[in-house]
Amino acid sequence: MAERKPVESWLTDMDGVLIHEGVPIPGADAFLKKLRDSGRPFLVLTNNSIYTPRDLHARLSRMGLDVPVENIWTSALATAQFLADQRPGGSAYVIGEAGLTTALHDVGYILTDHDPDFVILGETRTYSFEALTKAVRLINGGARFIATNPDNVGPSAEGDLPATGSVAALITAATGKKPYFVGKPNPLMMRAGLNAIGAHSESSAMIGDRMDTDVLAGLEAGMRTFLVLTGVTQPKDVDRYPFRPSEVVDSIADLVDLV
């Protein structure tokens, strides 16, 4: 078996790896500082489409974590780039927040509820029956169904929240149409992120806390994968999957010396 190349570029998930319930995970600051000091290409990825990179930069800064705006890659950005490639200057009906609508505006998309090319479902905390009904009718009328990410639940201080995947399932039940999910574990999001920083999969690593999104996305993109145990996955969970990460570590602190 060919020896793996040293890791030259890093992609890391945010929730469960760098932060947990709004608090930095020990080692996150040291890891990010070493990345910045080394000059190695890196991205912080998130399937959450609510916030813009500028919003996330500000939130992380308030926690004491310095991540430049250009080093943040969201499922909203990946979705906008995908749609700009698929249908430049197209139109969309959007259920989502500023992170998604801003990304679509930035690639020249028209947001409308009149005969759109696409219905795009993203993360929001204010899903309305009216908006979901409109989405169902537009999809039944021929609009193509896109969703930013397949996560069924998202974290909060009070416990799990229903997320994009759960709401997409509702729309699928009403229309018979399944969405195309752009975010992790779709390797499309990973490859677009790698391209954005000029990195190559064979010399890059993905760090995550979820087997079903982070590790799977890294594997399918041909990257080395590190599973941390500071998020949703526990050691006993790993054997439930037919694939394994390259390494399992306790936390991001264990990876500082690899940068």
What would you call each of these model-derived segments?
Residues A2-R40, S49-W73, L77-V259:
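Asp-based, Mg2+/Mn2+-dependent phosphohydrolase catalytic module
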